[in-house]
Amino acid sequence: MLESANECAYAVAEHVGGTVENFVQMMNDKAAELGCVNTHFNNPHGLSEGEDATLHYTCCYDMALIAKAAYQNETFRAITATKTYQIPPTNKHDEITYLQNHNEMIHAFKTRGQYLYEYCVGGKTGYTTAANSTLVTFAEKDDMTLICVIMNAQSPAQWTDSIALYNYYFENFSLYNVAQNETRLENGEMDTGMLNTNSSFVKIDPAGNIVLPKSAEFSEAAPAVSYDNTSDDVLANIRYTFAGHDVGGADIVSTGVKADTFSFD
């Protein structure tokens, strides 16, 4: 990943999928599972020449969905944050192989640090003649982890645009923990259908967050409770909208308290 070694992409594809074709199908299946609607992979490395030019494509939104899923993987996070790496001598190569991350936002690769960004924690560069310079990055500040996707950029716009977008978001938006700020649920001011939230057996999952403009109050976010994605522990879901946009949510979960009966309205 650090050096964009396409031959390694083929090796991974054959190791994981058995064949390159099977692995590419796995890639497309995973993209569909993540909710991608404008993506189709035709190879494991990303180059799109010849036949691949029409069969291998994606968009910024879909790539952000894929990046979000990838960032959940601890090994991926470690690799994408690595600035330099040394491969020791092997039976095929008797010298150390030095690798450098091409992401100028975390490592001064060619630009002498001109585009280093203190909040960037990883990312991946790309380039094809059709897509021009592309860049997916991750940045963390004030408990927020953001993903930025830039495509069809004329260098150095992939760096400058990413930094400008991150700065705008960090300066104008804040993260709110739902469990710490939501009072309408326990006060009975939220339409929850049949679930009786006055019960001591339910609570809001503390992992849930929403993002709002710094000029807005948490109470201005409109909640909606659904039962679409439930499990043994997740009893319901709250999603919030602000100015017509989904801004995050949280699960309503069981407190783990055992009872002979469970309270519903």
What are the functions of these language-model segments?
Residues L2-A9, H56-C60:
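Short alpha-helical patches at coil-to-helix transitions and adjacent helical residues
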